[in-house]
C-alpha cells in the first residue's frame, strides 16, 4: 500500500499527506479503534478477492503494526502468517526523548493458503562487504574465491563417492561431493587447491555465486526526492512482486498513492489494479506512463454499495452494473 498511517502521541491514527505542490492528498484523523475497524473491513474484502495461491503484504507504521497483526491473524488465520519484515526506511536518527531512535517500519506478509502460495524463492546478490568476507582469496587473474572440502556430511557404504581418491580416504561419516572422476577433471582445470600438507579443497568463485536467500530485514530506504507523499521504494516493490506472483498475474494496490506498485507491476509484465480515494493520487497515477489501462471513476453511490457488500461476487456484480 502506498498510503501509510502513523500513530501520534495521543494515540490517534493520522493520515495527512501533502503532494509535491503542497496540495493535501489525504486528510483523516481517527481514533486507534476507528482505524483498526477501517483496516479490518478492508482486509476481509481483500481476503475474498485474493486468489487461493495469492499473498498480501501490508506496509504499516511500527507503532500500530502489532495491533494490525492480531487482526490479520483473525482474518487470514495464524497459519497463514509468513513474516514480520523490518524495513529500514532511513538513516539512524533520534527525535524521541528517552527512547531509541526509529529507522524502520513493518511489512506484514500473509498468504491465502500457506500450502499453495506462489513462492519463487528469488535470490539477491551479495554486497561488496559480504563478497570480501566470504571470498577472501584472490587468484592470479584477480578473481575472488574461497575453498570448501571435497566431502560432505553423510556416509555412503557403496558407490564411487565412498571410495578413496588418489589414495585419500573419505573421512568417517562423510562422502565425496561428486564422483572422483570429476575431481580429476576439476584438478586439471585448476579448480582444486592443494595445501602445503597435501589437503585438497574445491575452489568456489565469487562471480559464479548465485545469490543469497532474502531475510526478514530489508534495507530499502525511502526515495530521496519523492514525487508524492508516502511514495515507496520501487526496488522493494519489484522484489515483492517477483517473489509472490508470476507473469500475467494480477497485482492489486488498494491504496495506490503515486502508483509505484502499478509501475513496478507493469514493468514485470503483471496485470494490475490500483485504487485510491484521493483525486491528487489518481491524477498522479494517470500521468505515469503505464501503457494502456481502463479507468473507472466510481461515484459515491457505487462506492457505498461496494463498501457495504459482503462477498467478492457481490462487489464484482456492482462494478459490472456500473459500466452499463
Please identify what each model-predicted range represents.
Residues 1-284, 291-292:
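Core catalytic lobe of class I
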Residues 279-324:
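PRPP-dependent phosphoribosyltransferase catalytic core
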